[in-house]
Amino acid sequence: MSIHTDDFGQGGFAQGGFPPDKAPDKLRMISAAPVSRGEEAMERALRPKLLQEYVGQAKAREQLEIFIGAARKRNEALDHVLLFGPPGLGKTTLSHIIAAELGVNLRQTSGPVLEKPKDLAALLTNLEANDVLFIDEIHRLSPVVEEILYPALEDYQIDIMIGEGPAARSIKLDLQPFTLVGATTRAGMLTNPLRDRFGIVARLEFYTAEELARIVRRSAGLLNAPIDDEGAFEIARRSRGTPRIANRLLRRVRDYADVRGDGSITRELADRALAMLDVDPQGFDIMDRKLLEAVVHRFDGGPVGLDNIAASIGEEAGTIEDVIEPYLIQQGFLQRTPRGRMATQAAYRHLGLPVPGDDAS
């Protein structure tokens, strides 16, 4: 199996290889987006290679085991797969695992990189039989590129234009059978025609603290970092249900253990290290607290619109919606309503404030 990453220039993004809304200066210790290319390289080293090594996402894992096994048994291309959910939950990892389990090559790119039909055509025509094409941020495909993709997904054919002007003509090219794995944090932004062409759709959920503790212990073993069960759980419970964050916090706690301790990670040492990093026991950092405080203090608990929150705390609306909000909502500290965001009773208690309407009690 081989893996290819197609850049078509500067990683498809602005300087530094990051999309504008995820530039390194916008990221936090507990952001689910990768901080740097160096971190991406470290993630690859810690990434599980097969489904049996993959922790969590039991429903998606079971489905993929069955569908991959059936495709392998029939020597066919796996049906096209859509993976969606918040960032950092393992969509890219699963794409690599799918290719490895099928024993085929993986070609990797992202939606913003595919600016022109010829970019996609170059990828598709170089795929071998049953290969996997992984498109991250597939919701950001341009309409003209998406149109080219439809016949490729349905009939393994593409139409390309030869020549220019009056002499231009369209020719049909046959493709090898292949599997498209699309990943997105915003499934609602996919067009219906594209969404309907995926035969396998898997939603990735936030991980439990117990699942993340298993991931932390596995990663610590690969990093040769001694850690006990309580130390692993302390890191896991502050990781916002996200493996990428758990691995990042583990690496920083390991640094702390090497300099301020004897190299071993215990619960007490992890607590000191994470307090230094401003990650509280709930897994919140200063941005989470700023958001909750803004909703409670500046907007009387809500409801308040996303744009108003963004302006209030100096953060982009997309970052709030994709990175900060999901965990706060999942943990019951924030509510989305038709009229806007509202702070819950848990948010007031977390900030040490009296809950409105609790005066009588």
Curated annotation (Swiss-Prot):
Q: Name one GO biological process term.
A: DNA recombination
Q: Where does DNA bind?
A: R336, R341
Q: Which GO terms describe its molecular function?
A: ATP binding; ATP hydrolysis activity; four-way junction DNA binding; four-way junction helicase activity
| CC per GO annotation | cytoplasm; Holliday junction resolvase complex
Q: Provide the residue positions that the database annotates as binding ATP.
A: L46, R47, G88, K91, T92, T93, E154, D155, Y156, R197, Y207, R244
The gene name reads ruvB
Which species is this UniProt entry from?
Answer: Delftia acidovorans (strain DSM 14801 / SPH-1)
Q: What is its main location?
A: cytoplasm
> What PANTHER family does the record tag this protein with?
HOLLIDAY JUNCTION BRANCH MIGRATION COMPLEX SUBUNIT RUVB (PTHR42848:SF1), PTHR42848
**InterPro entries the UniProt entry points to:** AAA+_ATPase, AAA_lid_4, DNA_helicase_Holl-junc_RuvB, P-loop_NTPase, RuvB-like_N, RuvB_C, WH-like_DNA-bd_sf, WH_DNA-bd_sf
Protein name in UniProt: Holliday junction branch migration complex subunit RuvB
Q: Spell out the NCBIfam families in the cross-references.
A: PRK00080.1 (NF000868), ruvB (TIGR00635)
According to its UniProt entry, the function of this protein is described as: The RuvA-RuvB-RuvC complex processes Holliday junction (HJ) DNA during genetic recombination and DNA repair, while the RuvA-RuvB complex plays an important role in the rescue of blocked DNA replication forks via replication fork reversal (RFR). RuvA specifically binds to HJ cruciform DNA, conferring on it an open structure. The RuvB hexamer acts as an ATP-dependent pump, pulling dsDNA into and through the RuvAB complex. RuvB forms 2 homohexamers on either side of HJ DNA bound by 1 or 2 RuvA tetramers; 4 subunits per hexamer contact DNA at a time.
Q: What positions belong to coiled-coil segments? A: none
Family assignment from sequence similarity: Belongs to the RuvB family.
Zinc is among the record's keywords: no
